[in-house]
């Protein structure tokens, strides 16, 4: 049976459903092919970081997630004693949201379906091939029938063992695991007083966070078990023994609902695009799960790719736009792999290692150092290469935080509210600006700032991308300001034939 969609996503985890939602709000006919008939009940990831929360806020769905999670104003770097302080960061979401991945996935799947995405669960992708004009995806449906989908693009969001990546023959260089650790979702009859614990001694490291009123995630890194193969099952007795040795108590650990062993393998796809095929999330990059960053970076991949694919499909993308996905997101994941490798090296239980950890913890107590590292973990410091065809500006390529605006009619609105439909926003901060520019996919807003903002001082106009990054900004002092703005609009809205 032959079916047609404009875009096919292989992999129905959080990244796949985030991408499907982005395509759907742009009116792109999309389907998701997911091997599992039902979502996995356990959760690998537990946290959504500030930048991811900003993206959800841009689409007007943040409260759905916040209502089911718990806000934590801090994060951690390599389980050091000094926590990362998110509360002072320049964001409307200065916290980590503790929310199990299973709930995140459910919310994103529901959102994607509500926007019209078709989901094939219990379906296995067998072959993904392309020519210059289309992609053919052959899959086995849950009833055993073999179907073929023809689409303009396909995206592999199908995890570390990605079928899409392998069939596209995209290299996945990196390193295999050299150490392993264990985790368990358990009941603790005598939990830590605050419910949260991060501890490292010469006997190993432990992290404990609450999942629900009666269940906790326990992570143990034992120097005596780091060479245990990943496929060796974790036992309740192992977790209890390690807790007792490291913490002096096993906290009354009982009733594990899920236990797993994980390693520090680190790999990254050599390229994120091969013609009409793209990779996102774990299909593009894997790493040691330090700092809870992997899911977040994957969701940010989806947010970067969605509007670009939609523009290409609708015929409004300049020729260079699709290549910019790799150019922007590959370096972002390189930074992720660097900082998680650094965190892995810091998890050292020798005497020298503990001294190094103590010194690093002291350094994190300096506000500037803490802010720098927090910017990396939160992904708020991700900045894309500036558009070199436009005059240099300190804002070009940076994310733009949410802010209160006073509109020309005197009413106030939050900046992110204008991004809910996934369009570009041309924000003019001068009342004399031309607010009659009409370009499909561009919303023009003339406003003033409700509060002084040094970063925006003397700025005339900003073109804000659908993912909240600044495409370009023009200062009021720029020569031929109006001409430069028109040039910038033409640069990003070059009309092409539909692909």
From Swiss-Prot:
GO terms for biological process: catabolic process. GO terms for molecular function: FAD binding; oxidoreductase activity; oxidoreductase activity, acting on paired donors, with incorporation or reduction of molecular oxygen, NAD(P)H as one donor, and incorporation of one atom of oxygen. It is an enzyme of class 1 (oxidoreductase). Keywords: Aromatic hydrocarbons catabolism, FAD, Flavoprotein, Monooxygenase, NADP, Oxidoreductase. It comes from the Bacteria. Its EC number is 1.14.13.-. FAD binds at residues 6-35, 272-282. Its cofactor is FAD. Belongs to the PheA/TfdB FAD monooxygenase family. PANTHER family: BINDING MONOOXYGENASE, PUTATIVE (JCVI)-RELATED (PTHR43004:SF19), TRK SYSTEM POTASSIUM UPTAKE PROTEIN (PTHR43004). This is Uncharacterized aromatic compound monooxygenase YhjG. The lineage of its organism: Bacteria, Bacillati, Bacillota, Bacilli, Bacillales.
